[in-house]
Amino acid sequence: MIPVVALVGRPNVGKSTLFNRLTRTRDALVADFPGLTRDRKYGRAEVEGHEFIIIDTGGIDGTEDGVETRMAGQSLVAIEEADIVLFMVDARAGLMPADEGIAKHLRSREKMTVLVANKTDGLDPDMVTADFYSLGMGEVYAIAASHGRGVTSLLETVLLPFVQDEIEEPVELTEEEENAAYWAALEAEEQASEEEAEDDFNPEDLPIKLAIVGRPNVGKSTLTNRILGEERVVVYDMPGTTRDSIYIPMVRDEREYILIDTAGVRKRGKVTETVEKFSVIKTLQAIEDANVVLLVIDAREGISDQDLSLLGFILNSGRSLVIVMNKWDGLSQEVRDQVKDTLDLRLGFIDFARIHFISALHGSGVGNLFESVTEAYSCATRRVSTAMLTRIMQMASDDHQPPLVRGRRVKLKYAHAGGYNPPIVVIHGNQVKDLPDSYKRYLMNYYRRSLEVMGTPIRIQFKEGENPFAEKRNKLTPTQLRKRKRLMSHLKKSK
């Protein structure tokens, strides 16, 4: 089992900074702002070849109210999941009543706890850590997470011995058993390499990255928790509850997924806090990183311009799409009909995306989402042969010939796959770059119908073959040169 390490402490003591330092990423949002982290965030770290899992948590200060209560609950869950707890305190702020309350709870859980005093840069470590010994947590390790000072010593002194203790003692084998094990391992390795060489890359072997995006307070985290069957992320009736993108692995029907719960995206003019700007960037990065995007829309508020703006970013990113109309419960039939009419009117240009009407709070319709998700992913990653793509191109050309350009008919020669997720079809021919947009849309829709592609956009790219005689002058052959010489000689004599 890989050891699990939880980072616990008051708000703004540097837990996310240490998380980024240990995982060597910038996955956790960091700013000088209490309460920035609200959900449990998981990451992998390594000490001398030994892996362990790091959990970043929201702060606990004992005065939680409203959404902060949920944040504290996430931290308590992380403590229960952990093998080691790094209890972080702020050396600059000194010992606080909330630190004593957290220490009391940790002692009651009987977890292996290490007291870490952060923000000791520029200070005398012995002097600033003296007060924290009164917590009764043993040795105090002084670090400066933002600069990395003391972090390596912390890892080697605390975490590495724990990881090594987890490694089982090797079992003594006889010489015959060692030889048999060696040849069995060698045979298995050769067989695996042969199979790997024979088998093509199979996207079905990879987990589907599923991003849940939308405006603030449309129910993204509620939907995430409903899918997972636990309160994995903080849910509260207040816009902006989620501030970071949370990656959560899960398995459903023997298929692996990675759920990405994101922060809400508002109009640019309303994004004022620096923290929120970082959150929006994280959301847009999550869309780029995802395979399939669930765009959650509040059915009671209808489709806004911001929904369309977010939709445009998803399409420009080439991501597969499933539209989710949340909060469908409680709407009258008349309102539901109006919402559907609005969808047909404003989203008619993306007829390839499945639309689901659900209630994340009560769970109605949520189970049907994954059928559309797997369909969209399969269509986006399906391999299609050059022969098939060329045949479809020829059928489309026979049904509706390309138009004339400057008096000449555009000629389509052949087509092949240019990429996947989204599917890209590259068409070669003469004057293809002069094709009007209407004919390009015709080809795109023809490929979509022929390949039965749903849930993902298709991109068509055109390439023209180079003219081999473009910059070449006509040169006479040796025979032609001899004839020319005789002709010139004859003309001179005749004069």
Curated annotation (Swiss-Prot):
It holds the Pfam family KH_dom-like. Residues 382-466 form the KH-like domain. Gene3D superfamilies: 3.30.300.20, P-loop containing nucleotide triphosphate hydrolases. SUPFAM superfamilies: P-loop containing nucleoside triphosphate hydrolases. GO terms for molecular function: GTP binding; ribosome binding. GO terms for biological process: ribosome biogenesis. Residues 3-166, 208-381 form the EngA-type G domain. Associates with the 50S ribosomal subunit. PANTHER family: GTPASE DER. This is GTPase Der. It comes from Pectobacterium atrosepticum (strain SCRI 1043 / ATCC BAA-672) (Erwinia carotovora subsp. atroseptica). The gene is der.
